[in-house]
Amino acid sequence: MTTSLTWHDVLADEKQQPYFVNTLNTVAAERQSGQTIYPPQKDVFNAFRYTELNNVKVVILGQDPYHGPGQAHGLAFSVRPGIATPPSLLNMYKELEGSLPGFVRPAHGYLESWAHQGVLLLNTVLTVRAGQAHSHASLGWETFTDKVISLINEHREGVVFLLWGAHAQKKGAIIDPKRHHVLKAPHPSPLSAHRGFFGCNHFVLTNEWLEKRGEKPIDWMPVLPMESE
């Protein structure tokens, strides 16, 4: 395990690759043509900004950014304060309520406090056109996030990967289960949560794993920045 490496160290070469340059150029061209793209440009890489490589303890894989106004801000499943909590995240809160004594469902869906504790909230595609789900799925983001997962697999040890749904599980096939702790369940979407996401106990199992390794468990109660100061 390499503890001092940063995202910049391991991704600098990847960001020079022609496919990645093309991805950024395509997104920029769409923005300049008047298309509304989510999240805003300044937020596209927030998952990496809030959770440095050497601090990654848990990875939660999402798929596409939210494509409604004001929702996406670069962290999978999370929405900005003041935005209604989306259905999948409500189901994550429901699972937390059912498995963690004392967990009280917050009135917001802002998960930055998870990210600061080492939970990488990574969408596998980092941008989307407003109102058009999966509209940027073929731009090259999947190649980039495959690389991110392989780098975590290589440079970290004992990371908990929470793989919810077929897309995340396929994406996580490269993870070495001897080096990391892989937990799988159906997606928390209302379409599939009742097929085994509810009752999966992943948040509790994650903390048990971290404590067994002598690491600080995650405080899964999301707090807004002003609440934690």
Curated annotation (Swiss-Prot):
One of the record's GO cellular component terms: cytoplasm
GO biological process: base-excision repair, AP site formation via deaminated base removal
Disulfide bonds: none
Domain of life (superkingdom): Bacteria
GO molecular function, one term: uracil DNA N-glycosylase activity
Keywords assigned: Cytoplasm, DNA damage, DNA repair, Hydrolase
Active-site positions on this chain: 64
EC class name: hydrolase
Record localization: Cytoplasm
Chief localisation class: cytoplasm
Family: Belongs to the uracil-DNA glycosylase (UDG) superfamily. UNG family.
Annotated function: Excises uracil residues from the DNA which can arise as a result of misincorporation of dUMP residues by DNA polymerase or due to deamination of cytosine.
HAMAP family with a match to the protein in the record: UDG
Protein name: Uracil-DNA glycosylase
Provenance organism: Enterobacter sp. (strain 638)
